[in-house]
Amino acid sequence: MTKQTGRLTLPTDADIVEETIRLKNLLGADALRDCDGTEMPDALLNEPVKKYATYYTTRKDNAWAEQNPEEIQQEYLISNRVTARSEKLCIRLMEGFHTQQLKVNTLDDPKRWWEVIDRTTGEVVSVDDWEFKKEREEVEIKTIPYHEYTVSFLAFLIWDPVHMYNFITNDWKDTPHQLTYDVRQPKTQKYVKEKLKRWCEENPQIDVVRFTTFFHQFTLTFDDKKREKFVEWFGYSASVSPVSYTHLRAHETSAH
């Protein structure tokens, strides 16, 4: 009886090379792949099967992100609801969020891109009635006593959410936090295209490229205790920015 192979892909890692080969032969796997946070071991590159390689379009290049901090990926956050007890209220923006994952965007004008809402009346508070205190990362609001208020604001994703999830779940210790970058931004878009082309040319042994971590797929936002605070598996919550909003509005205007 002829031994059949195919339709089975085995994940692998650097410390299970021999076991991977044994299972490949035993189960008749026709492909091997690396996993998130790992790379295909060199010892497996000559195995007579297809090779799948994970490729990250929006992370795993901290040098680029550090050189272009204004093009790091962003998302909108909403502060805690806070009740005013006088005619002035200060809301701490990052309270309840993990500061290793998120950083307040102080580069773009808060009065243009943020919103303060009186949750008791449902009305948007005039930009003349609040100020952002950059050094304290607080918003100071002229308030009506005993009304509830929130602030919606932009924050940079300074730790990729999927990498953070894997870091916490797998209890990684010494792995550097991976920064994000936004492929809609002009410099990053050009850089990412050139980098992908170069990677394909330098890795002819790879048969299938597994693209992963697209920010339009899901959102993972963690609280200050590294617990999942907000999770959305189908949406665009973590792929917003002034640039993307401006492009969207321009497209809507031209469509009409």
Predicted feature descriptions by range:
Residues 246-253:
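Conserved small/polar residues in nucleotide/adenosyl-binding loops
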Residues 60-64, 216-221:
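Short catalytic/ligand-binding loop motif for oxyanion handling, primarily in non-cytosolic enzymes
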Residues 1-198, 202-206:
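Mature N-terminal, pre-catalytic/accessory segment of carbohydrate-active enzymes
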Residues 209:
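Conserved, mostly hydrophobic/aromatic
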Residues 38-39, 214-217:
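Short, solvent-exposed loop/turn segments at secondary-structure junctions
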Residues 48, 69-70, 223-232:
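Short secondary-structure boundary/capping segments
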